[in-house]
Amino acid sequence: MEWNKGFSASYYMAIVDPVTWRDTDRAEITGGNIERDESGLMQSASIDCVDFPDEELYVRIYLNARQDGDADHVPLFTGIATTPDDDFNGGLNSNTVECFSVLKPADDVLLPLGWYAPAGVDADIIIRQLLDITNAPVDIEESAPYLKTSIVADEDDTNLSMVQRIIDAINWKIRISGEGVIGVYPKSADPVVSFDPVTNDCIEPAIKVSRDWYSCPNVYRALDEDLSAIARDDSEESPFSTVNRGREIWMQDTSCDLADNESIAEYAARRLKEEQKAAITASYDRRFHPDIMPGDVIRLKYPTQGLNGLFRVKSQSIELGYGAKTSEDVTNE
């Protein structure tokens, strides 16, 4: 499939066996939306359908795409469907079903008071134990680093919130596939796809772009176990410096990822420089592409709109209608 060209789209919903994770029954849908982002439960769906069972079920939403004799069958979302809302029109009963992501069971259970993730243990072991409460398959790269410091659960921490704290500590990411597989991987700066007006034009002309340098730091404190360092920008040549802005704007890092032979002071200076750039946020609609999820990096080459470089996807909304139109928010790397 050439996703930058037009295709016809149809959709259906499968009931999923929570044990085998395979499709069983099938239900027709008439529309809806799928929401994706980087935080919380990360995914949700609102599905319009007819005669949906009045019970909690695992479901999977599929896109059937056809283009000039080619066809593709793409799972868009797998999650837990709640009890449907009913809309009666004479003898016809239509439903709107709200669906949670496969992470919901891990968000519903509080950790015991006093629970902690111990330092020195491989992060993948703890993450897998915390996610075992879900029915979804879990895929974690074997090279997950160990925790440098213990992470003690707060009184309102759930299995999921602790997983997210561990993910932040090791600077990795969670990526939920359309099949509902929970993936835990290192963050990557490599783009999964490139968009430009000539060779791969998927983005609609209306693009909203905002720029913000207000929160750029000019003082950076790095804390790594018993080491610490502070880097400052007091240069008269720098637009972000304490001199030119007339005040200090601090940023602190407690999860330092030092390069080989890099001192904590060198790390603080490097990170200060990396953080001193204007934040660019862009919002647009585009044609559907199956390989892009929140947290992924894409390359945009739209210089007229001021978008030329690497951007990380923050959120998506997929409309289950013509062409699976995708609304997307991105920020510059």
Annotate each PLM feature.
Residues R22-V59, P105-A106, L110, A117-V121, ...:
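Extracellular/virion structural assembly segments
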